[in-house]
């Protein structure tokens, strides 16, 4: 992939939504919500503090993250639909 986010931006691939509920009910495509969970594909170098130093991001490529329902901007990179968002849009890292 030839894309590198700048500053505090993060490139995220959504994970596939569940096909069935815990009770075994199959969810049709029309009823599925966009997942709010994804994998970090690439991350910027970080933000600049007031004294000019780079503050690195807490997330890195490979992290599984949760983000807000309306977070990020959809982009198409190498034929794949991805999200680019600020690190502050990420709610947490799933371990």
Curated annotation (Swiss-Prot):
SUPFAM superfamilies: GroES-like
GO CC, alphabetical: cytoplasm
Subcellular location: Cytoplasm
Organism domain of life: Bacteria
MF GO annotations: ATP binding; metal ion binding; protein folding chaperone; protein-folding chaperone binding; unfolded protein binding
Xref: SMART domains: Cpn10
Matches recorded under InterPro entries: Chaperonin_GroES (IPR020818), Chaperonin_GroES_sf (IPR037124), Chaprnonin_Cpn10_CS (IPR018369), GroES-like_sf (IPR011032)
GO biological process: chaperone cofactor-dependent protein refolding
Keywords: Chaperone, Cytoplasm
Gene3D superfamilies for this protein: GroES chaperonin (2.30.33.40)
UniProt cross-references to HAMAP family, sorted A to Z: CH10 (MF_00580)
Family to which this protein belongs: Belongs to the GroES chaperonin family.
Function of the molecule: Together with the chaperonin GroEL, plays an essential role in assisting protein folding. The GroEL-GroES system forms a nano-cage that allows encapsulation of the non-native substrate proteins and provides a physical environment optimized to promote and accelerate protein folding. GroES binds to the apical surface of the GroEL ring, thereby capping the opening of the GroEL channel.
Subunit structure comment from the entry: Heptamer of 7 subunits arranged in a ring. Interacts with the chaperonin GroEL.
Protein name: Co-chaperonin GroES
Protein's organism: Zymomonas mobilis subsp. mobilis (strain ATCC 31821 / ZM4 / CP4)
